[in-house]
Amino acid sequence: MNSLTKEEFMKIYNEGENLTDKPIFIDFYATWWGPCKMFEQVLDKVTPEYTDKINLYKVNIEEEPEIAGLFRIMSVPNTVTISKSGDVFSMVGALNEETLKYFLEGLISKK
């Protein structure tokens, strides 16, 4: 997963870059928070098989508070997805491997 800066995010969002190509998955996290550390292990295990189907990003809320603010992130871990058509969905909490795979497959199949 690639770290996402404010500049990169604004380019993707404003120019629509990647929105018609692949859906976007953003993991908002804090390095010091236990649930984020646990979810990171799940992400590291599951997401490599999706790199060709989904644009995968992570955002450290302490380093990029403006991106977190745009999505009104109040707690972490928090996952935000943007479908190919531009629909935004947010989910709070860590997922297990099975649920994450189900979630990612649903994101891929959404038009």
Task: Annotate the PLM regions.
Residues 1-4, 109-111:
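N-terminal targeting signals for export/organelle localization
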Residues 3-4, 28, 40-43, 47, ...:
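Thiol-based oxidoreductase modules, predominantly thioredoxin-like and allied folds used
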Residues 3-23:
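A short beta-strand-turn-helix
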Residues 7-10, 65-66, 98:
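Acidic phosphotransfer microenvironment of two-component signaling modules
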Residues 21-22, 28-32, 75:
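Short pre-active-site segment immediately N-terminal to redox-active cysteine/selenocysteine motifs
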Residues 32-39:
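Short, thiol/selenol-centered motifs that function as redox-active sites or metal-ligating centers
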Residues 65-74:
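Mid-chain, well-packed structural core segment of small domains
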Residues 75, 80-111:
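Non-catalytic, surface beta->alpha helical segment in thiol-disulfide oxidoreductase systems
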